């Protein structure tokens, strides 16, 4: 597979969250995206009033379907960046230890250290580096090579500043991280998460 379908279920807008997540996954969706700054809840809100969020995590954990969380600030209208901090995902990783968790944008720009910490702390947490210009990657994730087996490539294309995925790959390779690190980040890690 070269293109994998990704979907989302917003527990604030669904009456039967468990039924909806099952329906979406039964369609062949391979990953669920949760976008806290735009969906307006913390990733661990299931520990309070938004218990339905746990239904999404539980179903994905049972099926081995990764959940990607937007981490890092958003400049788009109506975003609430208080929900952009990845630290609440610490609870998710503990409460759902078999759930593959992907931290989109590696917390950029304000929460990179937190995202890196979570990926190092938890076996089931991975960093995804889309939205970070490759030439600036080492500024945002200076020890990316230390975590190479848990970092996923991404471009966030099409978006401002991303002229093409090919150019992003070329800029990434120009960092000189070494062939093995590049292979893990560009291919191996995603192949393992999405068999």
Regions found by a protein language model. Name each.
Residues 26-31, 62-66, 95-99, 119-126, ...:
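Glycine-enriched alpha-helix->loop->beta-strand junction motifs that scaffold or abut catalytic
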Residues 11-15, 39-41, 73-77, 107-114, ...:
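Active-site environment of divalent metal-dependent phosphoester hydrolases
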Residues 24, 32, 60, 105, ...:
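Conserved, mostly hydrophobic/aromatic
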């Amino acid at each position: 597979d070269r293109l994998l379908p990704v979907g989302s279920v917003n527990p604030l807008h669904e009456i039967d969250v468990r039924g909806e997540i099952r329906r979406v996954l039964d369609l062949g969706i391979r990953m669920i995206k949760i976008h806290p700054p735009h969906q307006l809840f913390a990733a661990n809100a299931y520990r309070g009033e938004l218990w339905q969020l746990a239904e999404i995590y539980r179903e994905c954990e049972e099926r081995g379907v990764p959940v990607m969380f937007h981490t890092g600030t958003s400049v788009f209208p109506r975003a609430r960046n208080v929900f952009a901090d990845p630290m609440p995902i610490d609870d998710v990783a503990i409460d759902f230890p078999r759930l593959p968790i992907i931290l989109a944008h590696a917390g950029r720009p304000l929460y990179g250290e937190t995202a890196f910490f979570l990926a190092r702390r938890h076996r089931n947490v991975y960093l995804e580096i889309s939205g970070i210009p490759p030439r600036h990657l080492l500024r945002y994730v200076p020890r990316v090579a230390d975590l190479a087996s848990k970092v996923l490539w991404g471009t966030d294309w099409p978006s401002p500043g991303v002229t093409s995925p090919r150019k992003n790959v070329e800029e990434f390779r120009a960092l000189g991280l070494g062939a093995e690190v590049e292979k893990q980040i560009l291919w191996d890690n995603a192949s393992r998460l999405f068999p």
